[in-house]
Swiss-Prot record:
Principal subcellular localization: secreted
Localization terms from the record: Secreted
Protein name per Swiss-Prot or TrEMBL: Isotocin-neurophysin IT 1
PANTHER family: ISOTOCIN, NEUROPHYSIN
A GO molecular-function descriptor: neurohypophyseal hormone activity
Role of this protein: Isotocin causes contraction of smooth muscles.
Cysteines joined through disulfide linkages: 21-26, 42-86, 45-59, 53-76, 60-66, 93-106, 100-118, 107-112
Transmembrane segments: none
Modified residues (Glycine amide): 29
PROSITE patterns: NEUROHYPOPHYS_HORM
Record has Secreted as a keyword: yes
Species assigned in the record: Oncorhynchus keta
InterPro entries, per database record: Neurhyp_horm, Neurhyp_horm_dom_sf, Neurohypophysial_hormone_CS
Signal peptide, first to last residue: 1-20
Amino acid sequence: MFGTSVSALCLLFLLSVCTACYISNCPIGGKRSALAFPSRKCMACGPGDRGRCFGPNICCGEGMGCYVGSPEAAGCVEENYLPSPCEAGGRVCGSEEGRCAAPGICCDVEGCSIDQSCTEEDEAEYISQSVSSSHGHDLLMKLLNMISHTPPHRVHK
């Protein structure tokens, strides 16, 4: 009985001091170290570096829309190798990890979708800066249609 309680006590002690990270993509310093890094903007991308990376193959920006799987977004894969997390785009939309990327477009690391909440309030500035809202919406629909019918470009090494 005494041996069992000592073994249990030792096991509890080892578990309390164990700080191993069992997730394959843990940041340097462990799971909680990501909270210590200040938030930074994601890498610039696209024509003239006017956009921001939203995922390893997604580049979006004001006045240019989104590039998904194209050469303009190829540099975004480098974001995966940086040690600190980044924050892209405007406010949260769609899923919990989605962000407003352009007027009417919500993106997360996996892809983009049309989201009407991204055309309200903060994103209304994008529309007023570019063209009239009805023309901007037509252009957005054409761009999303092209993206959905175009196979992703592959970067050859």
